[in-house]
Amino acid sequence: MPRPPRKRTVEFVPEINYFKPAGVPLRELQEEVLNVDELEAVRLKDIEGLDQQDAAKKMNVSRSTFQLILTNAREKISKALVSGKAIRIEGGIYQVRDCQCGCEQHRHRGGPKSS
């Protein structure tokens, strides 16, 4: 029996979780589902500019697991862009990192939210 998967740690949970090509009705679209932990891997590597080892530590996974998550995420995003599919962001095995920044739901968009 395989061991249960370990939760990946994320710092960012998006408020907007659906993207679609302009001008195409929803009923005609196929979707790619991007897990929250996959989005976090892309964010850490491509936006934050972390190397894979540091990003893996932030997500509480091994470097090889991070590479797999990142590869899967990039493949899904590429398929959606090339094929004109919608992207739905949901699910995955993750936990939100506790922080002391007062950011409300850990959305981490440039620091704490102002009141």
Swiss-Prot record:
InterPro entries: RNA_pol_sigma_r3/r4-like, UPF0251, WH-like_DNA-bd_sf. Belongs to the UPF0251 family. This is UPF0251 protein Nther_2417.
